[in-house]
Amino acid sequence: MKELFCLSFASAAFLAFVAVANDGFPSSDCVRRKYIWFGWDTQNLSAEQVLDNAASFDESVYDGVPVSVVVRNPETGKDIRVHHVLDNPEVTDAMIADKIPVLKEIVSHRGLRESFVSSFYTPKTRVPWTDDATWAKAARSMGAIARAAKSAGVKGVFFDREEYHPTEKQFEWREGDPDFEACARLARQRGAQLFREVFRAHPTAVVFSCYGMLTACTTFDYFGSPDVMDATRQKHDLWPHFYNGILDAAPWEAKLVDGTEVAYEYLQSREEYAKSAACVKVRGGSCVAPENRNKYAAVSQASFGFFLDAYVKTNKTARYWYEPLNGSRLGRFDDNLWGASQWSDEYVWLYAASQRMTGIHWRNKSGHFNGWTTPDDRLPGYDEIAFANKDPIAWFPRRVAELAASGNLTNLFAKDIGEVLKPTKEDARRLFGVIEVQNAKAGEWYGFRFRACGDVQSIVRWGEKGLRSRPYGASILPSVTPMGRPDADGRRQAIGVVRIPNDLQSPVIVLKVALDSHPKAGIDGFELYRLFDPREY
């Protein structure tokens, strides 16, 4: 063990500590990462079929799905999916009323509580921007969908603006439309028209779009343009104008989630995800009307999408084939998911397209998607990595229990630090301790756990051997500041989980501890485990 650890005491001048104050910030209010499964399976099944498989979602890493609601058209007797609002007949409250109990039961499940109701897909046949009747019908349908979502306790709606019908591009200006400036005004009007109904019914709705403002604007590189209107004119692009209409209608209490679908091309995880998240709030505003910029900054959230096919394809010449990282394709996924989870505001979404992968093992009487594989079937270790990245602190005891059950749990720190430590010369009031794990490998996951009494502050950081730990690199959420109520002995438990970034040449993990000089202040029961290494899968 001597080559693994170095326990030393240092001057306060060289250490950084984080103390978490609980006053005014109850843990239940903390924003946690939410993973949404966006595969085509859920969009081609019904709300009832999702509910029939809810138990499988409860056991999964996911928190929700977009739910495709199927209703009966009373005029034709045929079933329609409500999200085709521009193609379909009007969806009324009466048509969707019997789906409210189904939706309510769906979101009562742990693995589905963050689900959305699918509310808009681009039309199969392009609708003229001047067609008042069709847009008014679509707006009424959106209102009915939002009212059902609100009544069922669903967080919000899913909005898909991707052009699935290349010859019918709704958000591209065409010959026969009014001149571009007039059509841009109409597009903004239609965006407001549709979403005014949504927010009137559900003022705090979360509107999730795989392609939000940022995605569209980075695709066409408008950020450097001194005249965004002119830039959109040159590209015949009406989407930013429609999105401004959504902002016109949105209350300040709403959330507009930019799914950043192009994030599946972010392979330099720390840099690209961080830059993209900043762009959602900062640079995306350059494509927003001045009167909406403050609202845009307040209601916009950065999210990131994962195209899982890229991690399991065997054809190395395929457009989306991601090479291994440190010899592991799971390691590549872990690195990307870590970046997305660190820098998303709230949501990360995952999907598959061509590899016959679904979020769970479906069991449907119809047989649809039965027998398809899950990501963990195709990329062993996927589930473990997903649980670790979504909520490292919750994952820690689960992973420790798994390792113990398999006989593979080893406490790398075999003896106590000491129940009571005395103050050092450097500070008569506090004692500062540092523990370094010196032979860690890039991509590995480690977990610390100890008990503390009295005034104890602590933090885990990664760094490079011989260098100070990077100020950028606080790689645990939350810190390991002791939390929870004291036990019978007056001790509280502290847990910290750290993942070593893949670009470190000589990584070390540093646990920094500060103890009050009071005789009863101290730490004991110290545990350190190597939790996961993607290279072992």
Regions found by a protein language model. Give the residues of each.
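Positively charged n-region of N-terminal signal peptides that target proteins for export
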Residues: M1-L4
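Bacterial N-terminal signal peptides
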Residues: S8-A19
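Glycan-processing catalytic domains of CAZymes
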Residues: F25-L412
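Short carbohydrate-recognition loop motifs
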Residues: A414-I435
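Extra-cytoplasmic beta-strand recognition segments
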Residues: L431-W462, A494-V498, N502, F526-E527
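Extracellular carbohydrate recognition and processing domains
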Residues: R470-S506
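Short beta-strand-plus-loop segments that form exposed binding edges in beta-rich domains
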Residues: L511-P519
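Exposed low-complexity, polar/acidic, P/S/T/G-rich flexible segments that act as propeptides
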Residues: K520-Y537
